[in-house]
Amino acid sequence: MSAEIICVGTELLLGEILNSNAQFLAQQLASLGIPHYYQTVVGDNPTRIKKVVAIACDRARLLIFTGGLGPTPDDLTTETLADFFATPLEERPEILADLERKYAHRGGFSPSNRKQALLPVGAQILPNPLGTAPGMIWQPRTGLTILTFPGVPAEMKQMWHETAVPFLCSQGWGKEVIYSRVLRFWGIPESMLAEKVAAQIAREHPTVAPYASNGEARLRITVRAKDEAEAQQLIQPVEAEIRQIIGLDCYGADEDTLAGVVARLLQERQQTVAVAESCTGGGLGEMLTRLPGSSLYFKGGVIAYANEIKVTLLGVNPEELEREGAVSAAVAAQMALGVKTRLASDWGVSITGIAGPGGATLRKPVGLVYIGVALPNGEVISREFRFSGQRGRDWVRYLSTMNALDLLRRQLLVNP
């Protein structure tokens, strides 16, 4: 038995508001173990709404509607559903009384508000404690259940939790859970990741699906089980296989971030880090200090755009700076060592590069970045990165910051 989410509203089609209701409902259905394979957005047009309903009835047994329950002429969900299933509408006295009470505190009840008291004959009221528009629970024919909710997210969510979920569970929905775990990777393209774990992706249970987001690759492992504990038992061996195959390119799972992983590693070792930034404008320091308790591991940073600051504050050799240029492996290494020494930290990390749009040459294009890491043992490494400048300055700065975090993470793991 599968569900389908149908969101009604021309404003959604025009992109005027974000369709967060569909995201919430999809997550809720997964947590209840109710499969759903389709989501539809349709405008405030009765003909098109009916076409959507006709298609949905052929492929789902639970239809969940949001939007179109208000008092205005373009709020058409209830009457369109009643018309589609050839069921008359009736005014519910209890809804009308509730509307009159609520509107008394909102400037008075008007005749147009009466339409919100109409439901198809046989439908059950789905109360709305926060707003004026009630929803309904309706089974217009055997084997089909319809739930309707207002489009206001806060109202919909409370109605879902308080009334819809208990109803669905009482009807035998939600006997299983659909549980997912997302593994996160940095430093490996999605296509290469998919090739390396092709055997795991080919399995049907658990399913493994690759995707990319904000420069990182991810694998979503999904399983259906009787409860979360069983789901985790099924996922664990698959996750272990993937981690063994991929190695250090897998940096975490679910809500982990590169900055959070670095922070945890530093705190476990009781070590500190300082940063020197030339093209990221403090972005690396911001990421490291976004987390609570960052003063335990973050000493501070130097934003050194001018060459004289690189020399006077970070100890970069002026002759080498002149010869190699500010954007070079040698300068990145000296910046990392300089900030580590100057701020008396265990680790030093530096970024120097050309974020664009200006400052580039044929030899040093936009997107050329060097990242340096000074280790506690005195060793200093630097790495060259060439990012595409076509996505703009902010993208180069973002990738520079993320790769600096990743390079530090890898060094923390291989230099315990």
Swiss-Prot record:
<dbReference type="InterPro" id="IPR036653">
    <property type="entry name" value="CinA-like_C"/>
</dbReference>
<comment type="similarity">
    <text>Belongs to the CinA family.</text>
</comment>
<dbReference type="InterPro" id="IPR050101">
    <property type="entry name" value="CinA"/>
</dbReference>
<dbReference type="InterPro" id="IPR008135">
    <property type="entry name" value="Competence-induced_CinA"/>
</dbReference>
<dbReference type="Pfam" id="PF18146">
    <property type="entry name" value="CinA_KH"/>
</dbReference>
<protein>
    <recommendedName>
        <fullName>CinA-like protein</fullName>
    </recommendedName>
</protein>
<dbReference type="InterPro" id="IPR001453">
    <property type="entry name" value="MoaB/Mog_dom"/>
</dbReference>
<dbReference type="InterPro" id="IPR008136">
    <property type="entry name" value="CinA_C"/>
</dbReference>
<dbReference type="Pfam" id="PF02464">
    <property type="entry name" value="CinA"/>
</dbReference>
<dbReference type="InterPro" id="IPR036425">
    <property type="entry name" value="MoaB/Mog-like_dom_sf"/>
</dbReference>
<dbReference type="Pfam" id="PF00994">
    <property type="entry name" value="MoCF_biosynth"/>
</dbReference>
<dbReference type="InterPro" id="IPR041424">
    <property type="entry name" value="CinA_KH"/>
</dbReference>
